[in-house]
């Protein structure tokens, strides 16, 4: 089996927390979720979201995140109150960019949308954001926290390059993509939290790379249903696996070995980020709550012996909000 052949990389499970039942964490995340308004986002309300009498641009960002990046939404709820709305805006910006690729039928249209967001970032730093909910909220975040323009532009530029429907040539190319998107998002989150620390940035770099790799793995069944495969070609070739094997949902050992190798790289990034947690300011830990969902996925895929098409991998963990709150309460990542 794939797991038994390579099992030495995987460390002990961390979500089991001995003695936790003896201490009762304060009510927090679930209460916040219940208090949030929840009407559906419609095209009509989106168009009017920044106008008078609408929910408001902040509510639009929150709803977009809740629907399109639920794990990011849950993590954002546990940030300090003064930072929450800015991170909602930042993550909503990322969602807007991420959904361009799947929402257009022609690359030219995707490039036009990316050009809109490039100009939007430029206009935000000229205090002239367009009348668009996410743009307005992002402008507020930039003004409030003096966010670095370079990180925002890196996210747009990398998403634009990724409009080509090509597999990553190697794991390094996937890591570079993750660094310029997910890690950049974390650098900006640290700025919102008021953290300027080399060790925190180092952790953000590795956690962002782990996030990018896990996202690529999780999306494999969806991409396969659209006749697309984006997994690193070098690892596929190493194990003699073709793109057609993934399109046919082949579950042979060599296919699972490909998934094992890729998942192991995410695991190593996560492990390395945690190896120097004592040197990272505690104030930075809330920015890294996504490690909970990353670890949850890596454990699940290990349990199914790296069968990327196993139905259990597509099921939401209903206990994730609780695990996130516990992680926040324990002040760790």
Curated annotation (Swiss-Prot):
A Pfam family that this protein carries is SQS_PSY
Q: Which GO terms describe its cellular component?
A: cytoplasm; mitochondrial inner membrane; mitochondrion; nucleus
Task: Give the UniProt record's GO annotations in the biological process aspect.
Answer: biosynthetic process; mitochondrial respiratory chain complex I assembly
Gene3D superfamilies in the record: Farnesyl Diphosphate Synthase
Looking up InterPro entries in the UniProt record yields: Isoprenoid_synthase_dom_sf, Squ/phyt_synthse
Question: Which tissues express it?
Answer: Widely expressed. A lower expression is observed in lung and kidney compared to heart, muscle and liver. In the kidney, expression is high in the basal zone of the proximal tubular cells.
Q: Does the keyword Membrane apply?
A: yes
User: Is Mitochondrion found in the keyword set?
Assistant: yes
| UniProtKB keywords | Cytoplasm, Disease variant, Membrane, Mitochondrion, Mitochondrion inner membrane, Nucleus, Primary mitochondrial disease, Transit peptide
Tell me the superkingdom of the source: Eukaryota
Instruction: Extract the transit peptide range from the record.
Output: 1-44
Give the disease association. Answer: Mitochondrial complex I deficiency, nuclear type 17: A form of mitochondrial complex I deficiency, the most common biochemical signature of mitochondrial disorders, a group of highly heterogeneous conditions characterized by defective oxidative phosphorylation, which collectively affects 1 in 5-10000 live births. Clinical disorders have variable severity, ranging from lethal neonatal disease to adult-onset neurodegenerative disorders.
Q: What does this protein do?
A: Involved in the assembly of mitochondrial NADH:ubiquinone oxidoreductase complex (complex I) at early stages. May play a role in the biogenesis of complex I subunit MT-ND1.
Family stated for the protein in its record: Belongs to the NDUFAF6 family.
Q: What is this protein called?
A: NADH dehydrogenase (ubiquinone) complex I, assembly factor 6
């Amino acid at each position: 089996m794939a797991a038994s052949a390579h099992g030495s990389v995987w460390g002990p499970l961390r979500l089991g927390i001995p003695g936790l039942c003896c201490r009762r964490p304060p009510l927090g995340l679930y209460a916040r979720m219940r208090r949030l308004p929840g009407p559906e986002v419609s095209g009509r309300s989106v168009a009017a979201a920044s106008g008078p009498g609408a929910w408001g641009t902040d509510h639009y960002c929150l709803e977009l995140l809740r629907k399109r990046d639920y794990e990011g939404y849950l993590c954002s709820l546990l940030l300090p109150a003064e930072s929450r709305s800015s991170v909602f805006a930042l993550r909503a910006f990322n969602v807007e960019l991420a959904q361009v690729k799947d929402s257009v039928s022609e690359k030219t249209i995707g490039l036009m949308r990316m050009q809109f967001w490039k100009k939007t970032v430029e206009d935000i730093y000229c205090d002239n954001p367009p009348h668009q909910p996410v743009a307005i909220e992002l402008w507020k975040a930039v003004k409030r926290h003096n966010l670095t323009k370079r990180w925002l532009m890196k996210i747009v530029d990398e998403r634009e390059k990724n409009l080509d429907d090509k597999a990553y040539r190697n794991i390094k190319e996937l890591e570079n993509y993750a660094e310029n998107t997910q890690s950049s998002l974390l650098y900006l989150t640290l700025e919102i939290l008021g953290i300027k620390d080399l060790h925190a940035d180092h952790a953000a770099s590795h956690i962002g790379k782990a996030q990018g790799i896990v996202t690529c793995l999780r999306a494999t069944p969806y991409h396969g249903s659209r006749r697309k495969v984006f997994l690193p070609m070098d690892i596929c070739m190493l194990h003699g696996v073709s793109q057609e094997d993934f399109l046919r949902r082949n579950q042979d050992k060599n296919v699972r070995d490909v998934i094992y190798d890729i998942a192991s790289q995410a695991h190593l990034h996560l492990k390395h980020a945690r190896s120097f947690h004592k040197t990272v300011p505690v104030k930075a830990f809330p920015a890294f709550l996504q490690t909970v969902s990353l670890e949850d996925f890596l454990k699940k895929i290990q349990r199914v012996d790296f069968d990327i098409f196993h139905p259990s991998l597509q099921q939401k963990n209903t206990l994730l909000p609780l695990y996130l709150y516990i992680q926040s309460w324990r002040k760790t990542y």
